[in-house]
Amino acid sequence: QLEDQKQQINELIKKTGNTTTNITYQQNNVNNNFKLLGYRNTDISHLSDKDFISCISHSNFCIPHLIKKIHFDPDKPENHNIYISNIKNNYAMTYDGDKWNLTNRDDIINDILEEKEIIIEEKLEEWLEKGKKYPEIMKKFTRYLEKKEHDVVLDKIKDEIKLVLFNNRNLIKN
């Protein structure tokens, strides 16, 4: 019986022959090089009409949504140039093109609110000049401008901006 087993083992070895296993390891390195833009030089060329319509459709929160699309788009890391690192203190971080600066949080929120409103207004004017008519969208933005005159609404908008700047801080690569 032992002889039979030896013979079976030898036959199996002959059938399988020399089996060589080649294991290949491949490592792909992808380097994405980009230059972080200064907060005042943020690039908005990637925004489409659809992006603007989407933001304005959020009525009172159109500005926080626009901030997300501009400053926290994973595909536009060069615009990751502003954030709030600690919700409890009164500062925000802004990049000026060379270095990060601690900035008064309320000042930067007022700044960013006004700046993004101007961007939307310019887009609406551009649409009118080109003959594109989005009456519902224009009406929504006009309503937003009227509602934001009330301090309660304005405070909610500013709070939402603060949350956007804080909640997306992890996208920023210092």
Regions found by a protein language model. Name each.
Residues Q7-N10, K14-N174:
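Extended amphipathic coiled-coil helices
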